[in-house]
């Protein structure tokens, strides 16, 4: 499976919302799709399933605002 698809699947799973795959430019926080608890869960899932460590200190809400932006950040980190 392609890395981008893995990330989108992970985001969809954590958010419990298919809009992520339908619109990868959706604003996750502005639209209320992600909250702080889901963000922490996402960071844990990224570490567990993708073997990429992201600390909460590295998390920047603007850089992680959309699924596409998250894919870009994670591609740089892996």
Curated annotation (Swiss-Prot):
Cited SUPFAM superfamilies: ACP-like
Family of this protein: Belongs to the DltC family.
Described function: Carrier protein involved in the D-alanylation of lipoteichoic acid (LTA). The loading of thioester-linked D-alanine onto DltC is catalyzed by D-alanine--D-alanyl carrier protein ligase DltA. The DltC-carried D-alanyl group is further transferred to cell membrane phosphatidylglycerol (PG) by forming an ester bond, probably catalyzed by DltD. D-alanylation of LTA plays an important role in modulating the properties of the cell wall in Gram-positive bacteria, influencing the net charge of the cell wall.
Record domain Carrier: where: 1-78
Record protein name field: D-alanyl carrier protein
Key words, A-Z: Cell wall biogenesis/degradation, Cytoplasm, Phosphopantetheine, Phosphoprotein
InterPro entries: ACP-like_sf (IPR036736), DltC (IPR003230), PP-bd_ACP (IPR009081)
Domain of life per record: Bacteria
GO process terms (BP): cell wall organization; lipoteichoic acid biosynthetic process
MF term (GO), any: D-alanyl carrier activity
Pathway: Cell wall biogenesis; lipoteichoic acid biosynthesis
One GO cellular component term noted in the UniProt record for this chain: cytoplasm
Record localization: Cytoplasm
UniProt keyword annotation of NADP present: no
Modified residues (O-(pantetheine 4'-phosphoryl)serine): 36
Post-translational modification: 4'-phosphopantetheine is transferred from CoA to a specific serine of apo-DCP.
């Amino acid at each position: 499976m392609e890395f981008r698809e893995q990330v989108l699947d992970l985001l969809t799973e954590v958010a419990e919302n298919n809009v992520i795959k339908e619109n990868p430019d959706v604003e996750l926080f502005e639209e209320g799709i992600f909250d702080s608890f889901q963000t922490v869960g996402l960071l844990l899932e990224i570490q567990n399933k993708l073997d990429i460590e992201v600390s909460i200190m590295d998390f920047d809400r603007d850089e992680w605002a959309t699924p596409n932006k998250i894919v870009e950040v994670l591609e740089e980190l892996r």
